[in-house]
Amino acid sequence: MAHPEFQVSTGKDDKFYFNLTAKNGLVILSSQGYKEKDGCKTGIASVKKNSSNKRHYERKDSKGGQYYFVLKAANSKVIGKSQMYKTNESSENGIDSIKSNARRAKINYMK
């Protein structure tokens, strides 16, 4: 993969999900399930709009001692969740990756 992209797929529950992948192909943000494809598209547009604003990221610690974050829209609803990171620094690097990749990421509908 030579460019970042939003990979949209349908889950076993027939809902639509997206994963934002970086240039290296690693997933850096995952969505909730959407009942409709248009809802998923709206979620992607919200990620593109809100990803550059550091106030929209909420940093969290897991019970297992790992770090992750959620990206929130202006209305405070969660629009994406990161993977788990072993260090806080790695988590911050994940945020930086989303900031630099989300706006230019293309949408790829998976089969």
Stretches found by the model and what they are:
Residues K99-K111:
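Glycine-rich beta-strand-turn "strand-cap" elements at beta-sheet edges
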Residues M1, K48-N53:
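Short secondary-structure junctions
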Residues C40, S91:
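Alpha-helical recognition helix of canonical C2H2 zinc-finger domains
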Residues S52-K54, G64, A102-A105:
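Short, intrinsically disordered/low-complexity patches at protein termini
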Residues M1-P4, R104:
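Charged, low-complexity amphipathic helices and coil/IDR segments
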Residues F6-S9, K15-K23, I28-Y34, G43-V47, ...:
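A structural feature that tracks compact, well-ordered secondary-structure segments
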